[in-house]
Amino acid sequence: MSEKATGEVEAELPEHPDADERRRWQELADEVREHQFRYYVKDAPIISDAEFDKLLRELQALEDAHPELRTPDSPTQLVGGAGFATEFAPAEHLERMLSLDNVFDSDELTAWAARISSETGDAAHFLCELKIDGVALSLVYRDGRLERGATRGDGRTGEDVTLNARTIDDIPERLTPSDEFPVPAVLEVRGEVFFRVADFEELNAGLVAEGKPPFANPRNSAAGSLRQKNPAVTARRKLRMICHGIGYTEGFTPASLHDAYRALGAWGLPVSEHTTKVSTVAEVAERIAYWGEHRHDVEHEIDGVVVKVDEVALQRRLGATSRAPRWAVAYKYPPEEATTKLLDIRVNVGRTGRVTPFAYMEPVKVAGSTVGLATLHNASEVKRKGVLIGDTVVIRKAGDVIPEVLGPVVDLRDGTEREFEFPTHCPECGTELAPAKEGDADIRCPNSRSCPAQLRERLFHLAGRGAFDIEGLGYEAATALLAAQVIPDEGDLFTLTADDLLRTELFTTKKGELSANGKRLLANLTKAKEQPLWRVLVALSIRHVGPTAARALATEFGSLEAIEAASEEELAAVEGVGPTIAAAVKDWFTVDWHRAIVDKWRAAGVRMADERDASIERTLEGLSIVVTGSLAGFSRDQAKEAIIARGGKAAGSVSKKTAYVVAGDAPGSKYDKAVELGVPVLDEDGFRRLLEQGPPVEPAE
C-alpha cells in the first residue's frame, strides 16, 4: 500500500489478469463486436438481446476486475455502431449521440436511482418514455429548415440519410413558429424511426406477394427502409418517427426535457403521447409495471421503458460515460416465449472462422413479429439444449427483439426426430473444421487465408472508417469482388482496374460500361493509398491491433518496416501496446502470406511510412495527453492527430503520467480521474493554446 501526497491511503491495486483472463477478454471483445456488426450494419442479428447483454456484462465484469484490460477500443467504451464502414456519406453529429445503459429488474433500477440521488439529493424528477424498437435518427434544423438527417453511427459520426428522412411524413421540412417557443437558430433533435405493427405486416405481405423475402421484425425493416439507396423506396414505406431528445442547440436552452418536448411539439415535431413525468422511483416502477401489462396495446413494438432525469442542469452534473448518459437508463422487459417446429439446423461461418449453427423453424408469431430463424451458438450448445431436428421447440424473444431457442418440448416427440450432425468441413471452402485449441467450445475454419466467408469480412474490415476508410467498398461490394474472382485476397485490392470491375455485375451498367460507383471506388482506392500508417496497421487485421495501438506504434516507429524489424521487447515497451499486442504483431509477420499482402500493397503505392510535417513545431514532445468529451472544433481523430503531429502521445486513459486532460462537453469518468489525480484539465481554448505554444498552459476554471 502507498500514500498519496495528501496523506490518504490508496486502495490496493487490482491483481493483474492471468493468461486465461486475457484470452477470455479478447474472445468476448471479438464476439461482441461481431454481433454489433450484424445488428448495426447488416440489420440481421443472430443472438437475443439477453445473450448479447450477458456477453457485454461478462466483458464489463472482467474489465472492472482488471482495469488494465479496458482499452479505448473495447466495446464497453464505444457506442454500438462504432468502427463499421457503410456506403452512405459520413455526417458528424453536432453533439455526441450516445446509447443507453440497460437494467433488467427492480433491484438494478433501484441501484441506478440511488446513484442519481447520491449526486442530486431529492431534486430530480423522472420522465418515463416507451422504448420504441426502431432505429435512431438525428435531425438538424437551421433557422427552422431541415438541413440534415443522420443515423447514430459511432455516436460522433453517422450516415447521412437526409433524402430518405425527408420522405417520412412525421418529419417537417420547416418548423412551425410558436409564440411561446421561438424557433432556435440551430436545433439538433434525436428520435426513433419505426414501423407501426400494422404497417410492418402490410409491408411484409407486399414483399411476399412480389416474391421477395419478408423482414424478420419491425426494427430490421425500419433500419433497412431508412438506409435505402433509392429514396423513392423509403417513401413508399410507411415509416414513422417520435422524438425523444435534443442534442446541440443555439437559441434554445430548456430547463427540463419535459419543457423541451413541449417545444418540439409546438414546432410540429412528433413527440410521444405516452411520456409521463413523475417524482419518485416508486412512481417509475408503477409506470414500468403498467406498460409491461399493456405493451401490445401500443401501435408500435416496445421492448422496455426509458427513464430519464428531467432537469437539464442535473443531467449536466451527472454527465456521461464514453457510450451512455449517466442520467438515463433503459428498463428492458422480460422476454416472451412461443413454441414452433424446428425444421432444420444449418451452419454459418463468421469473420473469425467461427462456425455457428442456426435453427430454421416454422414461422411463429412472438413478441409482435414473425420468427423463423434463431441461433444455437455452437455444437456444445445444441447438445446441451437437447434439441433434435423435427422437435417442437420453445423460442424466446429477449427484450422483445431477437429470438433464441430455449429447448425442446420432449413430450411432443413422435420418433421422427433426428440428431444434428455438425459438419466436419467448412461449408464455404471445404476445409476440415477444428477447435482453435483443445477444450474450445467453438469450432472454427482454419483456412483464414482463402475461406470466402473470412475473406469477405476482412475486406469489409479494411474498408472501414477505422482503417482505410474506402467509401464504396461495403459488404455487397466485397462479396461481388470475391464472387467474380476479381481478387484472390486483400493483397490485390489496390491493383484493381476498370477492366477488373467490369467483370462484376455490381459495377457494370446495362450498357456494359463501368458504373459511377465503380469509378468512385477506383478513385477512393487511390485516395486510400495516402492514408497514414496507423490506418494501414488497422487494415492488416493483426489480432489485438485497433486504432489506439496502431497510432502508438506508428508514432513510435514511423514506418511498417521499422515495426516489423523491432523486437518483441521494443514493441511491448511502447505506451499503449504492451506484451500481448507485441506478441501478436511479431506472430503476424511470421506468416508468409501476411508479408505478401504488405509487399503487394507497397508495390501498389500504399504509404508504408509517415512523413512528419516540418512546418509543425514539436511543441508537445513526450507529453501524454488525454481528450475526453465532445470538442466543437475537433473530431476525436482530429484532436489525436494534432497531438501526435506535435510529438505528443494521444493516450486513452488517465494516469499520474498524464500531462494534460482536454475536457469537452460531457467529459465522463476521465475528467473525474484527472481531478482525483490532480492532472491539469484544459478546455478547448486551452487545448488550442497548448497546440500553438506548448506548455505551460493554465488549467481551465
Curated annotation (Swiss-Prot):
GO terms for biological process: DNA repair; DNA replication. InterPro entries: BRCT_dom, BRCT_dom_sf, DisA/LigA_HHH, DNA_ligase, DNA_ligase_AS, DNA_ligase_CS, DNAligase_adenylation, DNAligase_N. Disruption phenotype: Essential, it cannot be disrupted. Gene3D superfamilies: 5' to 3' exonuclease, C-terminal subdomain, 6.20.10.30, BRCT domain, DNA ligase/mRNA capping enzyme, Helix hairpin bin, Nucleic acid-binding proteins. DNA ligase that catalyzes the formation of phosphodiester linkages between 5'-phosphoryl and 3'-hydroxyl groups in double-stranded DNA using NAD as a coenzyme and as the energy source for the reaction. It is essential for DNA replication and repair of damaged DNA. Probably the only ligase required for non-homologous end joining (NHEJ) repair of 3-overhangs. Its EC number is 6.5.1.2. NAD(+) binds at residues 49-53, 99-100, 129, 152, 192, 308, 332. It comes from Mycolicibacterium smegmatis (strain ATCC 700084 / mc(2)155) (Mycobacterium smegmatis). It catalyses: NAD(+) + (deoxyribonucleotide)n-3'-hydroxyl + 5'-phospho-(deoxyribonucleotide)m = (deoxyribonucleotide)n+m + AMP + beta-nicotinamide D-nucleotide. It is an enzyme of class 6 (ligase). Belongs to the NAD-dependent DNA ligase family. LigA subfamily. Zn(2+) binds at residues 426, 429, 445, 451. Residues 615-701 form the BRCT domain. Its cofactor is Mg(2+); Mn(2+). GO terms for cellular component: cytosol. Keywords: DNA damage, DNA repair, DNA replication, Ligase, Magnesium, Manganese, Metal-binding, NAD, Zinc. PANTHER family: CHROMOSOME TRANSMISSION FIDELITY FACTOR 18 (PTHR23389), DNA LIGASE (PTHR23389:SF9). This is DNA ligase A. GO terms for molecular function: DNA ligase (NAD+) activity; metal ion binding. The active site is at residue 131. Residues 1-23 are annotated as: Disordered. Pfam families: BRCT (PF00533), DNA_ligase_aden (PF01653), DNA_ligase_OB (PF03120), DNA_ligase_ZBD (PF03119), HHH_2 (PF12826), Nlig-Ia (PF22745).
